[in-house]
């Protein structure tokens, strides 16, 4: 099976902060091991030399990625690679991919991977547009472009049951019937970030929590900052907050200056340490190993989080707000609705060794089915 994997890399200068690239870097070799001939079309190649590379140029903004997929380049790519399966990691590009295949005279299945949902649903079923995709009121247009992409796909792959439910509901509201297209294929865990819970020691009355998520406003960073202050003031914990971006370009700061503002605020908070992996996954793993638990983001309607999986694969219990995929995936004893509940949970993790080790084992076990080989098998089954 010839697979053309179209990948938009939004953080080419900080690949370790780009979950889509990390996903491809893990999945493409596993697909190759399973017998597929994989070409990754991307600005940068993945690490395995067995995976073919077709260099592309990523759109300079998130809106160009959704509204300007570059049909001319797609037609050339289809003619050169003659794929049997095209993976569209930017769902909104699927209609352009369909048109390019038609023009190139290539008959290939289009599998859309919903790596990012530009919407979420409240507990009462209200559809909310992602504020990060709603500058100058563009959110509705992004939603419709997403729906058009779903309609153009032969297969639609999502991370979780939560994402499947939301995607189905959003499609129905825009007149798209997914039928039997939809498949749940979670992302793989990083083989470099796996630690047996048997090697973990519980904290001795004081714990270190780690927050390893991007500091965008739409990730709920202001809400996390509020919680961070409560935790370091009222629980026996200190926090490590990761700066995943480092120095960003002036263009990216102009589009969204929120990470720099939040980083500055967190850096002046007592009990909070800012750390960077400097793009090194080994250093990142060491930072995780030095922590005792992780904190999930307050991102509204979170459909999946690579950073949560990173923590759990290292045997770190992750606490999180009771919302979206987090409520589906994280153990109920570690979910909270209020800051007071979060304080009590972290106090227990810091002081109750039996409770801590139980949840370290549960965290690790929750990633057991996410090996690259297992995910590749599910992926290939979905696109056959």
Where are these regions (language model features)?
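Nucleotide-activated donor-binding/catalytic signature segment of Leloir-type glycosyltransferases, i.e.
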Residues: 253-282
